[in-house]
């Protein structure tokens, strides 16, 4: 991706991007889109069966990212009700229009004035589905399988209730102090947190070898609370109790995020890493 900020750079970068696309993919086709520089990354979880039933399960804020990859997600977002309802209508209409059948996620960039722009639809379960499960009580993986088997949804939109607040931190084998560089190695200590409202999904274990060739995700630490403040407090505790040694991880980064004034106030955007002085 290239960002053009004036007519001159647009022409030059258009030529550069076409050349890069031709060299990498054998096709010089490129997309030109409006550049949204200060926005939130909001995504809606949808579930649709083979019988025409479609529901959404609320939205997640995935604005804290590095290299356009998500690091922290939370649900519900802090959208105002008007924006949330309008986007939800668009999501349900789009899902029905394409005849979608399964779990999926429709993603947007949202500006502070409520203007929102469609990014993509992920036609699969996502890493951050866990926090939606925590606030809705639904097992999304189970429903993905049941829908594929032809089962009918046992509920409609009126039955969906979002209760409380949930946050997910992706614990990656990366070094935040070195621009999130990969940190392969062997885990010499590995202990996950527990307690009320804490959920950890992880494949890692003591002695696990972190490869430099695959995704750096070691685990997903999720915290649930009746309120956002309680979820943040539980996440802080979970991060303090999560012990990983032998490789660098994003745990210290997440701990700073939980104390960052902008995050605590819910005032985060996709440029959070570039604009936050405390991170």
Each language-model region and where it sits:
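ATP-dependent carboxylate activation and anion-phosphoryl transfer catalytic cores
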Residues: 3-279
